[in-house]
């Protein structure tokens, strides 16, 4: 039986607004991030979600909370959905790291697996725990739709692993998952299909008013 997983990156934080690697550092949401969580909650309330799971980090939990309230569900916190530990890169921007060690950044950009930052969690290990969590959710909710709130790097790595794509190229294959946007996959047994990528949950902006009719 097919299970649909609705993968969502948490709302914006101060570090993400500055393009800093947050990793396992527990950074809370900005006002914009809280608004993204509210939009996700409204979207989930009309989208037929059967269960919700999230990373233990507060930015993911706060993003999942409005959806849980809208649906009357309890959020299942899964340790396997925690963001990758970036080691030396935690709290830094790429430019700051390049200023200190340009060769380390070059290796990372070339292959984020073999060129991972010093002290960081191996990409293969992160992929294994993330996919184990996602498959567990799929197994326990056959035929259901599960909202999963996690992190930009972890979800991209998991997508590569599930779709049989090279882990070290996750940054090139999936350049970015937007805050609060939904990426939908289907899991059926050992097979995974990508149904959509980076679909926004915020309502579209209201159209600008047109010119007044002649004579008004």
Could you tell me what each predicted segment is?
Residues 56-57, 80, 149-153, 197:
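Short, well-ordered beta-to-alpha junction loops that form the rim of enzyme active sites
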Residues 39-106:
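Phosphate-coordination/substrate-recognition cap region in phosphate-metabolizing enzymes
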Residues 6, 76-78, 195:
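General small-molecule cofactor/ligand-binding pocket signal
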């Amino acid at each position: 039986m097919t299970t649909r997983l609705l993968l969502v990156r948490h709302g914006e934080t101060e570090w993400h607004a500055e393009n800093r690697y947050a990793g396992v550092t527990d950074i809370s949401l900005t006002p914009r991030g809280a608004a993204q969580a509210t939009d996700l909650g409204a979207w989930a309330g009309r989208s037929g979600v059967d269960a919700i799971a999230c990373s233990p980090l507060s930015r993911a939990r706060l993003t999942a909370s409005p959806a849980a309230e809208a649906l009357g569900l309890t959020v299942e916190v899964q340790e396997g959905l925690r963001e990758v530990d970036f080691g030396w890169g935690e709290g830094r921007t790429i430019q700051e790291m390049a200023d200190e060690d340009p060769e380390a950044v070059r290796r990372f950009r070339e292959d984020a697996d073999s060129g991972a930052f010093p002290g960081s969690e191996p990409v293969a290990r992160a992929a294994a725990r993330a996919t184990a969590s996602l498959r567990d959710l799929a197994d326990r909710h056959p035929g259901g739709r599960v909202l999963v709130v996690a992190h930009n790097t972890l979800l991209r790595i998991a997508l590569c692993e599930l779709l049989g794509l090279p882990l070290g190229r996750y940054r090139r294959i999936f350049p970015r998952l937007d805050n609060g946007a939904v990426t939908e996959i289907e899991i059926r047994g050992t097979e995974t299909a990508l149904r959509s990528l980076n679909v926004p949950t915020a309502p579209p902006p209201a159209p600008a008013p047109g010119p007044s009719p002649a004579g008004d």
